[in-house]
A protein has these predicted regions:
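Cyclophilin-like peptidyl-prolyl cis-trans isomerases
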Residues: 1-194
């Protein structure tokens, strides 16, 4: 029997994306995702960034909640014994800000194999239902958005693509609050939230 927790993203389009979370692959990252999702911080959120051929980036502003405005250590710092998973379509990865740490809950769906992401943007889940919705999102019409980090391409959907609700099934397990970075250089894309 599979005891992995799942997260179901109910989309305003009527579709759903079901993610199997992988706590043995990225324990603290899974804890951080569950922390945000269980408090409703991801609900009613419009997807903020789509880069066709690369990824669907759900948010780059901590879902607009100051409670999600924290960084977590890279998994290899907490769990050097865990071999990171390869990043490819069908995976769910956590974004990050280089040496400053991983984003608290800013996850993305890769649209191609990303060998350069291994060990940097941890794979913490896999899509078990709804890849067709992710491929649909790749093709929606987008417009460019000014972004405060040089060299980062940001295009948002012209028509909002909204996650209405994230439904968790923790399979009766309890998950701890995430370990957070003690000293934080917060990303410039969070500036307008301070």
């Amino acid at each position: 029997m599979n005891t992995h927790p799942t997260a179901t993203l109910h989309m305003a389009s009527g579709s759903k994306i079901v993610i199997e979370l992988l706590p043995e692959a990225a324990p603290n990252t899974v804890n951080s995702f569950i922390y945000a999702a269980s408090r409703g911080f991801m609900d009613h959120h419009a997807i903020q960034r789509i880069v066709p051929g690369n990824w669907v980036d759900v948010t780059y502003q901590a879902f607009g909640h100051k409670e999600c405005q924290y960084l977590i250590p890279n998994e290899f710092e907490l769990h050097p014994e865990i071999e990171p998973l390869d990043s490819h379509p069908g995976c769910v990865c956590m974004g990050g800000y280089g040496e400053d740490g991983l984003a608290s809950c800013e996850f993305f769906f890769p649209l191609r194999d990303c060998p350069d992401h291994k060990g940097i943007y941890p794979v913490f889940g896999k899509v078990i239902e709804g890849m067709d919705e992710i491929w649909r999102l790749e093709k929606v019409k987008t417009r460019p958005v000014d972004f405060p980090i040089p060299g980062v391409e940001v295009n948002e959907p012209v028509e909002p693509e909204v996650i209405e609700k994230v439904e968790l099934d923790l399979k009766g397990q309890t998950y701890l609050e995430p370990i957070r970075m003690k000293v934080q250089n917060l990303p410039p894309c969070w500036t307008d939230m301070r």
